[in-house]
UniProtKB/Swiss-Prot annotation:
This is Extensin. Residues 36-45, 70-264, 272-283 have a biased composition (Pro residues). One of its GO terms (cellular component) is primary cell wall. The keyword Signal applies. It comes from the Eukaryota. Residues 1-24 form the signal peptide. The gene is HRGP. Disulfide bonds: none annotated. Structural component in primary cell wall. It comes from Sorghum bicolor (Sorghum).
Length: 283
């Protein structure tokens, strides 16, 4: 059993070491798997100011070219090498201690003839002399003093009056009333009701369609221009005052009334359907 446990522990240690190595290669451990930093471009300096021109048509003098220093090449710092994984101490293999072997005793040689046992002669039994043990003188223990308690004064309690129990008077029972005897009501004689006689209501007489009488056409005479067909109503006379006004406005001439249009009824109509009514006169 102990050897099997040691083998299981060794297998677990080997598996954990393999997992740690895989994580370090994948980038989860010390510095592995991170991208290399890209080198930053060098910072540009300020632009040189242009010199003022001499005049119209003259080219400005070019300043001598400055030799720009070559930017230093960026060398990425070397990655710190991860410290080697400290190997876990292998547990000591348990070697069971050898059990002590029981000594093998050679079998005793078989005796051909068993030796005859001769019991040794017992010495005569001599009883030791019994001496009477002297008893010590009986000493009585001293009697303890008898404790007499001091007499307590008698406690006099006032007599508590016992409450008289209430006399139970039972509630008077109501008198037992017998239920009224049910007398069945007399049934009316079974007679079927006579159904009402249906009398149809009299229908109102249908109204006859009105006969169309065409209105007589007035003679086509033009009204005179001087006399209006509809005289204007007389203007309202003001109420009498203390000093009536002297100025009276002249009556305005009424405009000539337009001639009413002549109505020509349609010719094609059936005698059964009445013709449409004439339009109202136009004033």
């Amino acid at each position: 059993m102990m050897g099997g446990k040691a083998a299981l522990l060794l297998a677990l240690v080997a598996v954990t070491l393999a997992v740690v190595e895989i994580q370090a290669d994948a980038g989860y451990g010390y510095g592995g798997g991170y991208p290399t930093p890209t080198p930053k471009p060098p910072a540009k300096g300020p632009k040189p100011e242009k010199p003022p021109t001499k005049g119209h048509g003259h080219k400005p003098e070019k300043p001598p070219k400055e030799h720009k220093p070559t930017p230093p090449t960026y060398t990425p710092s070397p990655k710190p090498t991860p410290p080697p994984a400290t190997p876990k101490p292998t547990p000591p293999t348990y070697t069971p201690s050898p059990k002590p072997k029981s000594p093998v005793y050679p079998p005793p040689p078989k005796a051909s003839t068993p030796p005859t046992y001769t019991p040794s002669p017992k010495p005569p039994a001599t009883k030791p002399p019994t001496y009477p043990t002297p008893k010590p003188p009986a000493t009585k223990p001293p009697t303890p003093p008898v404790y007499t308690p001091s007499p307590k004064p008698p406690v006099t309690k006032p007599p508590t009056p016992k409450p008289t129990p209430p006399v139970y008077t039972p509630n008077p029972k109501p008198p037992v009333t017998k239920p009224p005897t049910h007398t069945p009501s007399p049934k009316p004689p079974t007679s079927k009701p006579t159904p009402p006689v249906y009398t149809p209501s009299p229908k109102p007489p249908k109204p006859s369609p009105p006969t169309y009488t065409p209105t007589p056409k007035p003679p086509a005479t033009k009204p005179p221009t001087s006399t209006p067909t509809h005289p204007k109503p007389t203007p309202h006379t003001p109420y009498p005052q203390a000093h009536p006004p002297t100025y009276k406005p002249a009556p305005k001439p009424s405009p000539p009334a337009p001639t009413p249009p002549t109505y020509t009824p349609p010719v094609s109509h059936t005698p059964s359907s009445p013709p449409p009514p004439p339009p109202p006169p136009y004033y």
